[in-house]
């Protein structure tokens, strides 16, 4: 039966409210993405790191045949993965000397802080486990939850590999960068040391050669 005028008006208003809400959520996500990039730009040694990690993680996801949705998710996660560092003081993040145990504990909180920052946005819910768990280790010695092996979400395992790789081929205040070939070789040599998923690491090295 045809809509009554008042019913139609109510439905239109509801749709407009939903559209406005979606636009606000999209804007909030854009703010977080922009904030993540801006956070790095303060430090010449990390500038561009997250964007590179996002792009290379997506490329690797394609290489191993993950679905398009997961390719898009891991690219976004790569850009945002260190957003939690906004809650860590610059005097700790940019310290060139040896970190104290307390400072290390502060830095290790960035994964949990990042998850909390992104949690209110439904559109980012799929990447929350990647943000929280990208510093877990295959042997269970990582943080924040000490997950082991396949308990760690596959996209967090991917990000862990790519994050380390980009750090190795980029300049840092405490060391010079190494070549892509040397970084891939070094990671392959350390594949059984317990940091990464050894099968995924082999695939990554294969892609980089």
Which role fits each region the language model picked out?
Residues 4, 30, 179:
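Residue-level recognition of oxygen-bearing side chains
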Residues 40-209:
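Metal-dependent catalytic cores of enzymes that make or break cyclic nucleotides
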Residues 2-12:
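C-terminal output helix
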Residues 8, 15-16, 35, 93, ...:
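Generic leucine side-chain signal with a strong bias for well-ordered alpha-helical environments
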Residues 13-26:
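The C-terminal output helix
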Residues 33-36, 45:
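Surface-exposed, interaction-prone regions with an acidic/low-complexity signature
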